[in-house]
Amino acid sequence: MSVHSSLREHPNWPRLVTLVRELAFIDGGSDDAFTLASGRNSRWFFDTKPVMMHPEASHILGELLNLRMDEMGADFVGGLELGAVPLTAIAIATADKESLRRGFMVRKEPKGRGGRKTNNPPGIEGSSL
């Protein structure tokens, strides 16, 4: 996976890299320390939740997410629960106040109760995501 050059060249990119190294990177000390979602074992693990919950890191994430989404012309930002929820909230909270971009999330299973079972905003169909 690569990072778009517009993000790597941003003045806040080096600081975000430092924060990710400090907050998310875990060296377990042995090759079988962590079992990954794929079932494979790894010595290393990235837990990005602390990055998303850190004030400075989340501000930089939001700035860079919005920069890239502006370049792409995205109308909406979101993804699969639970992982996409913090990033979606960061992106929406740091967007320009005049931004028309809206957030959404995709549930793994229907909630089965409540009024809007998908939590998606009206008009999302056919929009640029």
Please place each PLM-identified region on the residue numbering.
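Gly/Ser/Thr-rich beta-alpha loop segments that engage phosphate groups in nucleotides
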Residues: 41, 81, 85, 116-117
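Short, glycine/charge-rich flexible loops or terminal/linker lids adjacent to PRPP-binding catalytic cores
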Residues: 88-129
